Amino acid sequence: MVTQKIYIELKAFDHGLLDRSARNIVLVAKRSGAKVNGPIFFPRRTAKFIVNRSTHVDKKSREQFEIRTHKRLISLPKANSAILQALMSLQLPAGVDVKVKVVGG
């Protein structure tokens, strides 16, 4: 049985949804017998957009928008194929972007 190191990167705009998804991944990994590091919190990234309310005049009247992107990392240092299959069968919400990186094996 070959052991691999698995990194799971999660991104979302809603931090509550992101934390619930990270908790589900950690629960499934621990139930499968893996050692879990994380979730590791990354700094929140904020993008701000400022646009004029009017199309032609009144430069002083503007609308401000911002998007906050939250990010978490979960590391599984010694994972096997059974743990990877358990993680792949997990259903996550649509608002969470998941990237899985497998190192070794």
From Swiss-Prot:
Name the UniProt record assigns to this protein: Small ribosomal subunit protein uS10
Oligomer status and interactors: Part of the 30S ribosomal subunit.
Entry annotated with the keyword Ribosomal protein: yes
Family: Belongs to the universal ribosomal protein uS10 family.
SMART domains: Ribosomal_S10
Keyword Ribonucleoprotein recorded: yes
Species of the source: Anaplasma phagocytophilum (strain HZ)
Any one Gene Ontology BP term: translation
NCBIfam families from the UniProt entry: PRK00596.1, rpsJ_bact
One GO CC annotation: ribonucleoprotein complex
